[in-house]
């Protein structure tokens, strides 16, 4: 498990986060990390959005070019609290996570025009200490731990199992087995905090 999280978000949600309107991030699951922990924001690629030249300002008045950030890690925040939210919390979700009632029900998989499904829940991750990068980061700058890795105690090299062969993966200062991210997560994944990794 890494010591931070990377989330994938559509451009419209990234824009709302960047301008300070979206204060809570909605997810179906939550990490095993205890708050507070760092969350990196990856902005997904959407052609329709990319064709529009949109500029805005963050809550600090910084000009934000939304188009040139797609397909990159645009910023980070600290998640200091996670709340469980249910169908009956749709008003709170609309106000704080900028997700309308119908969108929230669709996200939870609750059929339209139904009052059932109160047991279905999502998790609201609180967004604090938001930083939008002047220069977005590439996905390949982030490391995800290899699930089948183990440490060689003699030289602290890190290896990954490939069939019957052991293939050299990467040296790591702290002896952890890790690899660069190549594709963004569907929702989120564990990563190493860039500030704690010296490569």
Positions of predicted regions on the chain:
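Structured alpha/beta reader/binder surfaces that contact nucleic acids or chromatin modification marks
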Residues: 1-199
């Amino acid at each position: 498990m890494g010591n931070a999280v990377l989330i994938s978000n559509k451009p419209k949600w990234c824009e709302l986060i960047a301008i300070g309107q979206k204060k809570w991030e909605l997810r179906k699951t939550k990490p095993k990390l205890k708050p507070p922990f760092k969350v990196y924001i990856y902005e997904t690629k959407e052609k329709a959005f990319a064709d529009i030249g949109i500029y805005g300002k963050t809550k600090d008045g910084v000009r934000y070019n939304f188009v040139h950030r797609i397909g990159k890690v645009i910023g980070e925040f600290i998640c200091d609290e996670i709340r469980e939210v249910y169908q009956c919390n749709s008003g709170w979700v609309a106000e704080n996570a900028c997700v309308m009632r119908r969108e929230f029900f669709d996200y939870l998989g609750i059929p339209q025009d139904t009052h059932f499904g109160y047991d279905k829940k999502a998790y609201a991750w609180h967004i604090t200490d938001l930083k939008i990068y002047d220069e977005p980061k590439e996905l390949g700058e982030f490391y995800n731990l290899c699930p089948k890795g183990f440490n060689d105690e003699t030289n602290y090299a890190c290896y990954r199992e490939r069939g019957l062969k052991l293939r050299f993966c990467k040296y790591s200062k702290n002896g952890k087995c890790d690899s660069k991210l190549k594709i963004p997560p569907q929702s989120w994944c564990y990563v190493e905090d860039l500030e704690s990794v010296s490569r």
